[in-house]
Regions:
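Membrane-embedded transport module
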Residues: 111-195
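Conserved ATP-binding TGD loop and adjacent catalytic N/P-domain core of P-type ATPases
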Residues: 1-139
């Protein structure tokens, strides 16, 4: 009133609870890129987690889609994490798309996974678990190949009767499944995904 201010409002972005430690943990293992539809007012605050050249502000949904689409041509696999409809195209174009949702019963864009917002801090653990699960799949295949190679060598030599071969064949499958199940449970406990 008459040049005398009685109050003022300061507007700013509010980030999800626990996002700082999540970005720090992910930044230790992966290159992090930020694609935001917002203006660059938060650039300084976000520079603690993202390199200056890895932050892109004012991005439209099409800009995000095009940027994520170019990553495979430069030899990068993108895991896109988004929380809005404006991220839908980029989520679908990425190698792995994870939608962060407050409520899983509402519409979520086409993606590979939906993560409840309250569990966002577990994302680094889920990614470590996924890496371990890939190793378990490879180890299971190697175990199966070794088991069958040994069994085949005995069978070719005539050292196994048809009855023993018939018994060993399902045991091969059972042992590989038991290994995969046990190793997956151990990996889940080790990474903190399962308690």
């Amino acid at each position: 009133v008459d040049g005398d201010y009685r109050c003022f409002f300061r507007l700013g972005n509010v980030y999800r609870q626990g996002i700082g430690p999540v970005l720090e943990a992910l930044g230790e293992r992966y290159r992090l890129l930020l694609l935001s539809g917002d203006n660059d007012r938060e650039r300084e605050k976000l520079s603690a987690f993202f390199a200056v050249d890895d932050m892109r502000f004012g991005q439209s949904p099409t800009d995000k889609l095009e940027f994520v689409g170019t990553l495979p041509t430069s030899g990068h696999n993108a895991l896109m994490v988004g929380d809005g409809l404006n991220d839908a195209g980029a989520l679908q174009a990425s190698a792995v798309g994870i939608a962060v949702s407050e409520n899983t019963s509402v519409f979520s864009p086409a993606c590979d996974g939906i993560l409840q917002a309250e569990h966002l801090q577990r994302l680094p653990r889920f990614l470590r678990f996924a890496t371990g699960a890939n190793r378990i799949v490879v180890a299971s295949m190697v175990l199966s190949l070794l088991y069958n190679a040994v069994g085949l060598s005995f069978a070719v030599q005539g050292a196994l009767s048809p009855l023993v071969s018939a018994i060993l064949m399902p045991l091969s499958s059972i042992s590989v499944m038991a290994f995969a199940t046990g190793a997956t449970r151990l990996a889940a406990r080790y990474t903190g995904v399962e308690r």
